[in-house]
Amino acid sequence: MDQFIKQDETGDLIETGMNVANHFLSAPIQGTNLLSKATIIPGVAPVLIGNPEQKNIQYPTASHQGSKSKGRSSGAKPIIVSSSEVGTGGTQIPEPLFAQTGQGGTVTTVYQDPTIQPTGSYRSVELAKIGKERMINRFVEKPRTSTPVTEFKRGGPGAAAQGQTIQEEGIDGNGASAGSKERSGSLSGATPYAHLSLPQQDSTPANVGIAQQSAISANEIMDLLRGMDARLQHLEQKVDKVLAQGSMVTQIKNELSTVKTTLATIEGMMATVKIMDPGNPTGVPVDELRRSFSDHVTIVSGPGDVSFSSSEEPTLYLDELARPIPKPRPAKQPKPQPVKDLAGRKVMITKMITDCVANPQMKQAFEQRLAKASTEDALNDIKRDIIRSAI
């Protein structure tokens, strides 16, 4: 049912109501208890001439109800009931929308002669009647008469449905039809291939072309996108690991630089220690060391070449009884110890006293001891005392 009122119908209702209101406001009303000529509205008296039982009034047809007023801008166009449309039998005029009342007046029912067209107040009553009917009919839904619509499916009609025609169902109004819903036959959401539609006999023909070929399945596209997304995430994880290793490499480089700095410091300190204490030789000649490593026993059992042997080396000999006896080694004469040059050591110790000893009294004591020292051991003792005092 149409829930909206058209603008033209609204204008008709307003004009009808204004005509009725103007009629009752302009008509003179005199209150009385009797129906006399003085109280009858002009134009109504001829109605009383006819038989009251023959009450007949013509109602407007559907053609009159659906007509629109073209000259609404210039004024209201009255609705005229023609005498040619009079039916059989009289019909009582319904009571008007507004009762004609006055001082002590009563509402009177008036009947109309079939030969006389309604004028005056009857014309207003007819207008009100028509307006009421329009208002009632507007909110009453009419029954719909339509033929069943055959269902149309994609891919063209079947062999049995090719000869049938499709008649659309009317909605008797201006609203849009909701139509019928059908599930798509394509899982990917694309429009599949469709045949040409046959021309409809009861409708205006239209140009129909061949539908496009089926598009690529949307599921396959989504699978490809998901695979690319997974690979991208895997690459991102690898890049994160590489960046983490890079930070670790940077940390290792920093630690290596620290180790190198510490090692250089230790090497510098060791060089300083070597300068301060170069060390002492053992005092054993190299020849003696070599000879000690080459000593061995040689047995001469008979005549032969004994030039390789040395008389200084211990050798076993046979006595008269052929018994091996060692020949005693002759006693060695002790060699005098070479006099070492202590002047360089004294210069070094003097420099140590000057740089390492800050106390003047201790410095003076070390200088006195250095002047009295004549052996290497004494110089070593003085050097150790200087280092201890510096620490």
Swiss-Prot record:
Pfam families: Paramyx_P_V_C. The keyword Heme does not apply. Residues 82-101, 143-208 are annotated as: Disordered. It is found in: Virion. Residues 218-245 form a coiled coil. Residues 198-208 have a biased composition (Polar residues). The modification Phosphoserine is found at S69, S188, S257, S292, S294, S301, S374. Residues 343-391 are annotated as: Interaction with the nucleoprotein. The keyword Phosphoprotein applies. Residues 348-391 are annotated as: X domain (XD). Keywords: Coiled coil, Phosphoprotein, Viral RNA replication, Virion. GO terms for biological process: negative stranded viral RNA replication; negative stranded viral RNA transcription. The modification Phosphothreonine is found at T10, T16, T39, T91, T150, T165, T250, T258, T282, T298, T375. Changing T101A: Reduced phosphorylation level of P. Higher level of viral RNA transcription. Essential cofactor of the RNA polymerase L that plays a central role in the transcription and replication by forming the polymerase complex with RNA polymerase L and recruiting L to the genomic N-RNA template for RNA synthesis. Also plays a central role in the encapsidation of nascent RNA chains by forming the encapsidation complex with the nucleocapsid protein N (N-P complex). Acts as a chaperone for newly synthesized free N protein, so-called N0, allowing encapsidation of nascent RNA chains during replication. Belongs to the rubulavirus/avulavirus P protein family. Homotetramer. Interacts (via multimerization domain) with polymerase L; this interaction forms the polymerase L-P complex. Interacts (via N-terminus) with N0 (via Ncore); this interaction allows P to chaperon N0 to avoid N polymerization before encapsidation. Interacts (via C-terminus) with N-RNA template; this interaction positions the polymerase on the template for both transcription and replication. Interacts with host RPS6KB1 kinase; this interaction may play a role in the viral replication and transcription. The N-terminus consists of a long intrinsically disordered tail. The central part contains the coiled-coil multimerization domain (MD or OD). Forms a four-stranded coiled coil structure. The C-terminus constitutes the alpha-helical X domain (XD) that binds to the nucleocapsid (N-RNA complex) and the L polymerase. This is Phosphoprotein. It comes from Mumps orthorubulavirus.
